[in-house]
């Protein structure tokens, strides 16, 4: 029977992580469980840096961006001997189960601990929206709001100078954030990793827009696809229109979470405790069709496919 749990945040931070921690902590305490917060993700777990959390530990946290427990990259956690030390630290503290909030790398760590016999529940916390088994991740909608605000501001100056703007959006190898921002921001063109990209085809589309009388344009592109400064120079050379690149960078990860992310994080945090009390371990939580769901974390990582939002792309193209 579970009496004490641990909670950590891992990988890149996302708005709503604090709300998720709060959801875990307060739900666990309501059910009579003790909660230990683990600093700096798997690194802190390995180094045995933990703190007892109570209701007041998470007061005034639901509106704060980032993660008050901290996060860190710790690739050494792939080493089974490192994980064995981590499990020993958990057992030494009397911790019976672990809630991990983070992205796919964090899920991998939780999966490895599960394979070694320690029960874990994964909550999807990343702005990239690239986690299998869930429609949306904690932080996605806040990042979307940040990106759209930036695009709106760029549109003001681009229209004033009849300029083309290339905006690089986070997402790693998932185009969801770029696609959503392109639709909500009214971008004229969108480039995502799920679809083959040609600079020449993009330029031809831009030229076609200019021929129709378009005075300015915004191109939204997912990071890692190309050097956006070089792309901007290429567009300017081929079209004769002044073109500038803007890399939004880590500003997309910050800020107070929007209400949807606060609600999603709170629901998922509480649901994680429900699962643990029901005897589940080695699960990852998601939301599908607005219903909370859970999947075997090993099956989710190794076998589940994440569908591309092709209908979003079709919509964006119709609105060019």
From Swiss-Prot:
Gene Ontology terms for molecular function: 6-phosphofructokinase activity; ATP binding; fructose-6-phosphate binding; GDP binding; identical protein binding; magnesium ion binding; ribonucleotide binding
Role description: Catalyzes the phosphorylation of D-fructose 6-phosphate to fructose 1,6-bisphosphate by ATP, the first committing step of glycolysis. In addition, is involved in the utilization of D-sedoheptulose 7-phosphate, an intermediate of the pentose phosphate pathway, via the sedoheptulose bisphosphate bypass pathway. Catalyzes the phosphorylation of D-sedoheptulose 7-phosphate to D-sedoheptulose 1,7-bisphosphate.
Gene assigned in the entry: pfkA
Primary site of residence: cytoplasm
Residue positions binding ADP: 22-26, 55-60, 155, 186-188, 212, 214-216
Catalytic activity: beta-D-fructose 6-phosphate + ATP = beta-D-fructose 1,6-bisphosphate + ADP + H(+); D-sedoheptulose 7-phosphate + ATP = D-sedoheptulose 1,7-bisphosphate + ADP + H(+)
Family statement: Belongs to the phosphofructokinase type A (PFKA) family. ATP-dependent PFK group I subfamily. Prokaryotic clade 'B1' sub-subfamily.
The protein's name in its UniProt record: ATP-dependent 6-phosphofructokinase isozyme 1
Record-linked PROSITE patterns: PHOSPHOFRUCTOKINASE
One GO term of the biological process aspect: fructose 1,6-bisphosphate metabolic process
Gene source species: Escherichia coli (strain K12)
């Amino acid at each position: 029977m579970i009496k004490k749990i641990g909670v950590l945040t891992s990988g890149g931070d996302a708005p709503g992580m604090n709300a998720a921690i709060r959801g875990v902590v307060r739900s666990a305490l309501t059910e009579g469980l003790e909660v230990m917060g683990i600093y700096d993700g798997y690194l802190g777990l390995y180094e045995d840096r933990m703190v007892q959390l109570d209701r007041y530990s998470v007061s005034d946290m639901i509106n704060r961006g980032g993660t008050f427990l901290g996060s860190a990259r710790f690739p050494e956690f792939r080493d089974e001997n490192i994980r064995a030390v981590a499990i020993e630290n958990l057992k030494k503290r009397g911790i019976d189960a672990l809630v991990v909030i983070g992205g796919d790398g964090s899920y991998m760590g939780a999966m490895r601990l599960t394979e070694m016999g320690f029960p874990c529940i994964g909550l999807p916390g990343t702005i990239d929206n690239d986690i299998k088994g869930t429609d949306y991740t904690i932080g996605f909608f806040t990042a979307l709001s940040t990106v759209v605000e930036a695009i709106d501001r760029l549109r003001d100056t681009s229209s004033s100078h009849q300029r083309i703007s290339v905006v690089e959006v986070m997402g790693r190898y998932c185009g969801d954030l770029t696609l959503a921002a392109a639709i909500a921001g009214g971008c004229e063109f969108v480039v995502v990793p799920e679809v083959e990209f040609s600079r020449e085809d993009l330029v031809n589309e831009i030229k076609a827009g200019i021929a129709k009388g378009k005075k300015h344009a915004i191109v939204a592109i997912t990071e890692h696809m190309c050097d956006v400064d070089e792309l901007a120079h290429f567009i300017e050379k081929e079209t004769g229109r002044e073109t500038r690149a803007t890399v939004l960078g880590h500003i997309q990860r910050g800020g107070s979470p929007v209400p949807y992310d606060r609600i999603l994080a709170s629901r998922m945090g509480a649901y994680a405790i429900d699962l643990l009390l029901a005897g589940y371990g080695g699960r990852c939580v998601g939301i599908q069709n607005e219903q909370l769901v859970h999947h075997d974390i090993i099956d989710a990582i190794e076998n589940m496919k994440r569908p591309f939002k092709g209908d979003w792309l079709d919509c964006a193209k119709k609105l060019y």
